Amino acid sequence: VRINSKLLLAVAVMPLLFTATAKAELNVFACEAEYAALAKALAPSADIYSATTAMQDPHQVQARPSLIAKMRQADLVVCAGADLEIGWLPMLQMKASNPKVKSTDKGLFFAADQVDTLDKLASVDRSMGDVHAKGNPHLHLDPERMLSIAQALSAKMIKLDPQNSSEYQQSLADFSQRWQAKIPQWQEQAKGLAGKKVIAYHSSFRYLFNWTGIEQVADLEPKPGLAPTSSHLASLLTRAEQGDVMAVIVASYQDERGAKWLGERANLPVLMLPMSVGGNEQSQDLFSLYDSLLALLNGVK
C-alpha cells in the first residue's frame, strides 16, 4: 500500500492549525492602561497595546508614527471616551486609515458609552477651560461601572471574533466572579473615608471620591486644564487653614509642585495616587490598583 506522505503531513498539521485558531488572537489597541488591563483580563491570549501609561496625561498624546502603526494593525480600539481622547484619537484614526476601527458599530469601543457618566454639561464654552460635555471620563475608578464596562467589552469581543466566544465568556465569568467578590471588601475598607475632605488636582478621582464618599472641596487647577497659579494657590491655602482637609491629592501623571507648596504651608500630607495600572509598584492589575488606592487613602494620618 502506497502512503501519500503529503496527505499524512496535511493530516498531522490539521490539529495544530485547529489549536492555533482556537485561541482568541484579537489585536487590541487600548488608549489607556486601565483598558489594556481590562482587555487582558477578558482576552488573555489577545495581542494588546496601550497608547499611554499611568505616568502620562491621557488628554495630551502625540499621534506618533509608532501609534499610527499599532492602530493600523488593530481589530479593536478600546478607549475611555466622553471626549477624553478628542485631541488625538481622531487624528490617529485618520492617519492609520483602518476601516475596522473607524466607528463604534465596528471595532471602536468607548467605555463612557456603556454607563452613566458624572457631571454632564448641557453646554460648554471656552471660558470654562478643558471640560467634557459628555461627563467626566475617568470612570474606571468606580467598581460597579467597571463591571458594566467589562460585560459590554466582552460582548464587543464576541461580536468581532465569534469563533472564540466561549473563551471570552469564560474569561468574563472568571473576571466578574473575582471582581464581585472584591467589591464588598473594598467597600469595607472605604467605610472610614466617607465624609473626609480633600483638595485634589483636576477631577481625575471624581468617581473614586463619589464611590468612597470623599469630598473634593477645592481643585489645584484654577480652571480645568490650567496649571495652578500663585494667586489660586494662595486662595487654596486660606481654604486649607480651615482645618478640615485630610490631604492634598495628585495623580501619578500630574505635576506635584503646586500640591507640595500647598502641603508644606498648610501642614497637610500630599498623596500621589496611581491613576491607573502601573501608576505605582503595587498596581499591577485592576484589582491591585483598587487595593493600592484604598491602602494609600487609609494610610493618611
Which residues fall in each region the model found?
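Bacterial N-terminal signal peptides
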Residues: 8-19
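Extracytoplasmic metal-acquisition and chelation regions
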Residues: 24-301
